[in-house]
Amino acid sequence: MISSVAPPPEKMLFQLSLRRRGISDRGVLQAMESVPRDRFVDAVHRDSAWRDTALPIACGQTISQPFVVAYMTEQLHLQPGHRVLEIGTGSGYHAAVLSRLVRDVVSVERFKTLADRARARLKELNYANVEVVLGDGFALPEGQGTFDRILVTAAMAELPQPLLDLLDPDGILIAPIGPGNGRQTLIRVQRKDDGFLRKPLVDVRFVPALPGIAREL
């Protein structure tokens, strides 16, 4: 695994910022420190890669603010044997963080350009337990099975039932729910024997999840 090349002061400030904002899970903090965020952004933004801010990537998308990545990851309550589905690969950064904490990650991206770039980047950095799939988050490819955890990284007006059905018993899903052009609520959904238990977490702002596959972008 390639380690970060961030100067030590930047890395220390990065970790301190996460701790000050309430991230306390040691595994999550170690994963956030070990994944080189500067390798997942365009060269023009690399000087800002270790700042706690979202940054633009291709296809009108963004790489999420590090605190949001850490918070969502912490709320998943991950275990080493877990199998995780991510809807919205983007740059591949969040998938890389997840991969340090679980057995396998399947990440679905609707933009071919982003999927191809993320797949190549993750391979180059030796994140071998991440599979990037070009697909539609609203109509997922068949044959992937079910998952211990599901992470949605784009805003949905509501959760599609087929997505919820992919959760294993006691599985957890984290997703931003609300309008694509405003603030959303990050929710935590846990599958129980008698249905799905939903809990609102915090207000967030994500780009909207769009149906279909953008093979030309």
Curated annotation (Swiss-Prot):
Active site annotation, chain numbering: 64
Record's subcellular location: Cytoplasm
Enzyme class: transferase
EC number: 2.1.1.77
GO cellular component: a single term: cytoplasm
Any one GO MF annotation of this record: protein-L-isoaspartate (D-aspartate) O-methyltransferase activity
Catalysis: reaction(s): [protein]-L-isoaspartate + S-adenosyl-L-methionine = [protein]-L-isoaspartate alpha-methyl ester + S-adenosyl-L-homocysteine
Superkingdom: Bacteria
Pfam families assigned to the protein according to its UniProt record, in alphabetical order: PCMT (PF01135)
One Gene Ontology term from the biological process aspect of the record: methylation
Keyword Translocase: no
Key words, A-Z: Cytoplasm, Methyltransferase, S-adenosyl-L-methionine, Transferase
Transmembrane segments: none
Function description: Catalyzes the methyl esterification of L-isoaspartyl residues in peptides and proteins that result from spontaneous decomposition of normal L-aspartyl and L-asparaginyl residues. It plays a role in the repair and/or degradation of damaged proteins.
Family under the similarity heading: Belongs to the methyltransferase superfamily. L-isoaspartyl/D-aspartyl protein methyltransferase family.
Protein name from the UniProt record: Protein-L-isoaspartate O-methyltransferase 2
Organism per entry: Rhodopseudomonas palustris (strain HaA2)
